[in-house]
Amino acid sequence: MEMRQPAVAGQFYPLRCENLENELKRCFEGLEIREQEVLGAVCPHAGYMYSGKVAAHVYATLPEADTYVIFGPNHTGYGSPVSVSRETWKTPLGNIDVDLELADGFLGSIVDADELGHKYEHSIEVQLPFLQYRFERDFKILPICMGMQDEETAVEVGNLLADLISESGKRAVIIASSDFTHYETAERAKEIDSEVIDSILNFDISGMYDRLYRRNASVCGYGPITAMLTASKKLGGSRATLLKYANSGDVSGDKDAVVGYAAIIVE
């Protein structure tokens, strides 16, 4: 069995199982676990110290599913422009199998089966312990890493995913892993991110790209967000809700150069 080893355990989140469980417990502290009919979500992927509590706002609402599809931006530049992983993923909390039926449905499309893009990438990996902490029953994942994030590509991937999910009859939740504005003041980050988030909440994909380019916004997972919105809408999603917005300065105290984080769900 081919295994995708953790790349950022001990960096973005604790390496040891017990310590990781304690950190996840801290992230969910004060949140009510209330499952909703969530089809898609936007979730941050920074170190748990900074964005874990924001991410927990999403995971506290997620329903049980057969498969959790996770779109992540490719920060490393390795691998195919858009790649799906077929390997089993290992975390300090255990192993998670990939939904090979859905993964193989992409073969022959714009999405390649390629492990290199996933090997060192953190954006998908950091979501997995949250799923393992929340759900005891077996579930599978579909990790899709996007180096090519233009609107046409992301919409095509989202439409294809929605068709595959519909044909499979499986219950799936689609997660777009993305941080928002990077290394601006807290005030400016919130100003830029508010515009981008407004487009997301209105399912206005073209408007989001326009605002990203016009504001030179450093949102890293706009392709994953677009693919998630496209697929969720095609599967019946009609309402998007911002659950939480914060920035790294809320933890570090440094408001001069922050990273923005948003928790958004689509129902």
Swiss-Prot record:
SUPFAM superfamilies: LigB-like. InterPro entries: MEMO1_fam. Gene3D superfamilies: LigB-like (3.40.830.10). Belongs to the MEMO1 family. PANTHER family: PROTEIN MEMO1. This is MEMO1 family protein MM_1761.
